[in-house]
Design a protein with these regions (language model features):
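Conserved short alpha-helical segments that host acidic/polar catalytic motifs at enzyme active sites
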Residues: 1-250, 254, 266-297, 336, ...
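Glycine-rich oxoanion-binding loops at beta->alpha junctions
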Residues: 69, 73-86, 277-290, 314-350, ...
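Acidic/histidine-rich
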Residues: 157-191, 466-492, 529, 534
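Generic C-terminus detector
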Residues: 231, 546, 561, 571-612
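Active-site phosphate/pyrophosphate-binding segments
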Residues: 264-268, 272-300, 390-519, 592-612
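Glycine-rich phosphate-binding loops that contact phosphosugars or nucleotide phosphates
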Residues: 294-436, 440-443, 523-569, 587, ...
Length: 612
């Protein structure tokens, strides 16, 4: 949520900032702005716009109207104060002696504002960010040095933040600082950069530094220096980003989401290949050893959104294959219920970005309780990756569309890998069964591709029901977890009211919502639960529902009940989610397209939720 870009170098800054901000649109925003310093005059120009980034581009003539080689930019997601030009970043002091952009939430903003009001400061916006810039200015006037001003402000602020800061009295410099909000520092031959995420600067450099909590960076065109909160200089290791810049482009597809749906065979294959060597699972890269798994008595999977649905699948798979009890928690609820974490357990944090605020908070609670943490993340060097005891990277590559597809699919692979490895180490399955499961898992990329090849039928069906007012998804066991993700895909990008229910719960109230014309999607891929789910599907059809059935090849008698049937390839039932989710992703996508909506950037949503 929110996006930050900064540049100091030999080129004009404004076009670079606008381009970088365009690469962060997936994070969600309602306004945007840039601040550019003109080296000849020393003046700092600030331009803001409410709405889409193209409005800011038009106001600045694509950046050409604002001259200068040093600047900071921002896309804002409103948290304090309504979406408006006045509340948009960058924010500044009255004389523009300090200019600042911010991602995060300052929890004690009212306390700090009261302090600053007593010191004679006035405020023009409703934002917590304006408090931050004036707090930095307050300490700058006291100390006379940017580093001390920033560090003292950091000590006073409670909450999360990533800052990009310019001082009028210090031309040719940008300062950056962070706590619990993502920020990276980049370097190329022409200058230095800051950004909230890799795609913003990937066209300019692959060489980045990850700035840690309570750390400050000082950037000039030629050099970057890092400091801890005590202003002691520290050393950082440069990291090379391995992503291909083209991977963050649409590549001929109409939307990023469709491209990313079609990239799933590759993403799944890459993730399996990273951990399966010569037919055996190798967790050396994760740091997780056989000894860590051997005495495991319980696993806690903690996540948000689609990653939480992955956790639900993980629960079924791990308990069935490895015979280890699993609890699945929403990260936003986990720490507030005072969880009773047992010894010899493992907390698994699942997050695409590795920066999800609630998941980070859950991770830290687990570590405070002395429970080891396995992070399942897609972004190398992210906060969750750095703070976890063990890290299982997924190899989805950059995922730009707000609605996750390929990251979800690679997270499923992480659950399968963990289940199989734990089962073998604990002696629950023998080598032959382990080999059998791994071999079947390796067929998933081809089976996903086969499912994608049947997308025209889904497109036809989606266009027919694009004007539905309600869509319900039902299933049992793993099929219920699949239904939850299918429903989320439908509601988040098509804006159609959609809910998922455990099919056996229909009689306990939900069936009263069924009436003529309601679309119900019945997911029935589990052999032992097939007849029971069909029975529930008959119940809703008898009350007027139009029924779509989703099952595996061979279960053709579903057509006796369903008005429209979709089939996916057979696989181990533990792995069915990987193929069954594909038609539901496509269905959500094609409904959104039929309605003419912004598929990649749905309203009110952000790709990376970095505030609680």
């Amino acid at each position: 949520m929110c996006g930050i870009v900064g540049y100091i170098g030999g080129d004009q800054a404004a076009p670079i900032l606008l381009h970088g901000l365009s690469k962060l649109e997936y994070r969600g925003y309602d306004s945007a702005g840039i601040a550019i310093r003109n080296e000849e005059t020393g003046n700092i120009s600030i331009v803001k716009a409410k709405g889409r980034l193209k409005i800011l581009s038009e106001k600045t003539n694509d950046g050409k109207a604002v001259q200068g080689t040093c600047g900071i930019g921002h896309t804002r997601w409103a948290t304090h104060g309504e979406p408006s030009e006045n509340n948009a970043h960058p924010h500044c002091t009255d004389d523009k002696s300090v200019v600042l952009v911010h991602n995060g939430i300052i929890e004690n903003y009212q306390e700090l504002k009261d302090k600053l009001l007593k010191s004679g400061y006035t405020f023009y916006s409703q934002t917590d960010t304006e408090i931050a810039v004036k707090l930095v200015d307050y300490y700058y006037k006291k100390t006379g040095t940017p580093l001390e001003a920033i560090s003292r402000a950091m000590l006073r602020i409670r909450g999360s933040y990533a800052f990009g800061i310019m001082f009028h009295d210090h031309p040719g410099k940008i300062f950056a600082a962070r706590k619990d909000s993502p920020l990276i520092i980049g370097k190329n031959e022409n200058g230095s950069l800051i950004a909230s995420d890799v795609p913003a600067i990937l066209d300019l450099t692959r060489n980045v530094y990850y700035i840690g909590n309570h750390e400050i960076a000082e950037l000039t065109q030629d050099e970057i220096h890092f400091y801890n909160i005590d202003r002691e200089e520290i050393q950082k290791e440069m990291v090379e980003i391995k992503w291909d810049a083209e991977a963050a482009e649409k590549g001929g597809y109409e939307h990023f989401m469709l491209k990313e749906i079609h990239e799933q065979p590759r993403a799944v294959r890459d993730t399996i290949g990273a951990y399966v060597k010569e037919g055996k699972i190798d967790f050396t890269e994760t740091g997780l050893t056989d000894e860590n798994l051997k005495d495991l008595e319980r696993i806690y999977i903690v996540a948000c959104g689609s990653a939480y649905h992955v956790g639900m699948v993980g629960k079924y798979v791990i308990e069935e294959i490895a015979d280890v009890p699993v609890e699945v928690d929403l990260a936003s609820e986990f720490r507030y219920r005072n969880p009773k974490l047992v010894k010899n357990s493992l907390v698994v944090i699942v997050s695409q970005s590795g920066e999800t605020a609630d998941s980070l908070a859950a991770l830290r609670l687990a570590k405070e309780r002395g429970i080891p943490v396995l992070g399942v993340v897609n972004v190398v060097g992210s906060s969750i990756a750095r703070e976890s005891d063990y890290v299982l990277y997924t190899y989805a590559g950059p995922e730009i569309s707000v609605a996750t597809t390929k990251a979800y699919s690679t997270q499923l692979i992480a659950m399968y890998l963990l289940a199989i490895q734990a089962a073998q180490v604990k002696g629950v399955i023998d080598d032959a069964r382990c080999e059998e499961l791994i071999t079947e898992m390796e067929t998933l990329p081809d089976k996903i591709q086969k499912t994608l090849d049947d997308k025209e039928r889904i497109q036809w069906f989606a266009s027919k029901y694009a004007n539905a007012k309600d869509v319900f998804f039902i299933g049992r066991g793993i099929d219920y977890a699949i239904s939850l993700e299918g429903s989320l895909k439908m509601k988040e990008i098509s804006y159609i009211h959609s809910e998922a229910y455990a099919a056996g719960e229909l009689k306990h109230g939900t069936i009263s919502l069924i009436e003529d014309g309601i679309l119900v999607v019945g997911v029935a891929t589990q052999k032992d639960l097939f007849e029971k789910t069909i029975s529930n599907m008959v119940e809703v059809k008898s009350r007027g529902a139009y029924l779509m059935g989703l099952t595996t090849y061979g279960n053709y008698n579903i057509e006796d009940t369903a008005d429209f049937a979709v089939y996916v390839p057979n696989t181990e039932e533990y792995f069915t989610t990987s193929v069954a989710i594909i038609p539901l992703q496509l269905m959500g996508y094609y409904v959104s397209v039929a309605k003419g909506l912004d598929v990649d950037k749905p309203r009110n949503l952000a790709k990376s939720v970095t505030v609680e």
